[in-house]
A protein has these predicted regions:
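Amphipathic alpha-helical dimerization/coiled-coil segments
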Residues: 1-6, 27-28, 80-109
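A cross-family signal for key residues in well-ordered alpha-helices
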Residues: 24, 56, 62, 94, ...
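Alpha-helical residues within the helix-turn-helix
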Residues: 38-39, 50, 56-57
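Beta-hairpin "wing" of winged helix-turn-helix
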Residues: 57-67, 73
C-alpha cells in the first residue's frame, strides 16, 4: 500500500481530464511516445510533457527511453492502490448510510 502522500499525489494527477484521458489511452498496455500522445490530444509538445511529468511523478506511468524516443506505459499497481482506497471508503460510507436508513425506519411512527 502506498503512503498517504503518494495517494494524494495520485489523486491530484487524476484530477485533470487530459491526464485521465492519457491514462485511458495507455490502458491498452502498449507504450506510447509523447509525440503519439500529443497528436491524439491535439496539444503542443510542452503541454503534453508537463502532463506526462505529473503522471510520472505520481508513479502512474513509467518512461522507457529508446534513443531519442521516450515511451510511456501505464503502471497499473498505482491505479490499483487508489482503487483499493476508494473501495475501502466506499464500503464504510455505504454501511453508514445503511445504518442511518435503518435507524430512521425504526423511528417512524
Amino acid at each position: 500500500m502506498r503512503s498517504a502522500a503518494a495517494l494524494d499525489q495520485t489523486f491530484r494527477a487524476l484530477a485533470d481530464q487530459t491526464r485521465r484521458s492519457m491514462i485511458h489511452a495507455l490502458a491498452g498496455g502498449e507504450a506510447r511516445s509523447a509525440g503519439e500522445l500529443g497528436a491524439q490530444f491535439h496539444s503542443a509538445q510542452p503541454t503534453i510533457s508537463r502532463h506526462l511529468k505529473v503522471l510520472e511523478n505520481a508513479r502512474l506511468i513509467e518512461r522507457q527511453v529508446e534513443g531519442r524516443i521516450h515511451r510511456f506505459r501505464l503502471r497499473r499497481s498505482s491505479l490499483k492502490d487508489a482503487g483499493d482506497w476508494i473501495r475501502r471508503h466506499q464500503a464504510f460510507w455505504t454501511g453508514a448510510v445503511d445504518q442511518l436508513e435503518q435507524l430512521l425506519k425504526e423511528q417512524e411512527p
